[in-house]
């Protein structure tokens, strides 16, 4: 059964949190697909993952490039799983995939300081639970550490 994780961002921006989660994904030997909602976010995230630290980068590509299926991390606007990912990250209100059960994990990241994002995440939580999936809810504390809330 797919494990669905909700990440309530409060004290760190997405640009700080997502690379860490993606690094852990690659350490497990998994492929990831990251679904965004705008071309601008796709381009910004593509640039950021190459340069987020001076010491390393995350190997990735977008579904607009050749060889999307070969990418360990694929950034997309679509609901497709072109790289055969084990985990799907949904950012900034990306819709739940119709094929949730085809993933080991589904991670939903949202800005807890944005009222609309919070309301959308609550709707997604209800839909996940009504679909019979296990879900956990993680919220950042003041130091940016994750605390399980549900």
Label for each model-derived stretch:
Residues 10, 33-39, 74-76, 89-93, 107, 111-112:
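Structural motif
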Residues 21-24, 48-52, 106, 123-127:
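Short, solvent-exposed amphipathic alpha-helical segments in soluble enzyme
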Residues 28, 45-49, 53-54, 131-134:
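Terminal and domain-boundary regions
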Residues 47-86:
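Helix-adjacent hinge/juxtasegments
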